[in-house]
Amino acid sequence: MKRIPDAVFLDRDGTVMEDAHYIKSPDQVRLIPGAAAAVKRINDAGVPAIVVTNQSGIARGIFTVADYEAVRSHFESLLQAHGAHIDASYYCPHHPTITGACDCRKPATRMFEGAIRDFALDPKKVAYVGDRWRDVVASKKLGGRGIMISSHMTTDEDRRRAQADGIETAASLGHAVEMLFDLTETPRSA
């Protein structure tokens, strides 16, 4: 029997918001067409929509934590203008060649584990949606359902790894949300 997830972990750049490569200013924020409606569908189901994002521009000195927070705030206000909201945001400010290895930068799982703890979630009952393999592979490490969507940042290597790991794919966030919230059973072939 299919069931809706208890929470949806969303990558930000390339999944909900257009990836303009190191977004450091609110005026660079653009929602991906259809993304606000997809987040609203998650909200309307009473399911937490939780952003989990790598932000190595902080470690690289391209933008500051304050810049990140200004972008996050504007991003969330754009969603709110469409009746959608994000329940929480988790970010990793590190980059391995600058700050050294960390346990929060995706594909590591610490940010997800923090959200699972903070929201008292069963990791086997959550969904992970992102445009890169590293955004969704936590579904294999922690449990749950991973769906990789396609963006201009999705590489052939991402696709190969997702296929090898048995991670589902979708054309967009809207399509991924349809997959997560469509509870009809798919007929089996004879």
Give the positions of each predicted feature.
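Active-site neighborhood of HAD-like aspartate-dependent phosphohydrolases
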Residues: 1-50
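Non-catalytic pre-domain segments flanking phosphatase-related domains
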Residues: 1-12, 178-190
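A short acidic, helix-capping loop that chelates divalent metal ions and anchors anionic groups
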Residues: 25, 57-62, 95-101, 156-159
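Substrate-recognition element of Asp-dependent hydrolases with the DxDx(T/V) motif
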Residues: 35, 39-72, 85-95
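Short, electropositive alpha-helical surface patch
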Residues: 61-76, 100-114, 142-144
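Conserved Lys-Pro-Asp/Glu-containing loop-to-beta segment of HAD-superfamily phosphomonoesterases
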Residues: 103-136
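Acidic, Mg2+-coordinating phosphoryl-transfer loop and its flanking beta/alpha structural elements
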Residues: 128-168
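Short acidic-hydrophobic, aromatic-tinged amphipathic segments that line or gate anion-handling sites
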Residues: 167-176
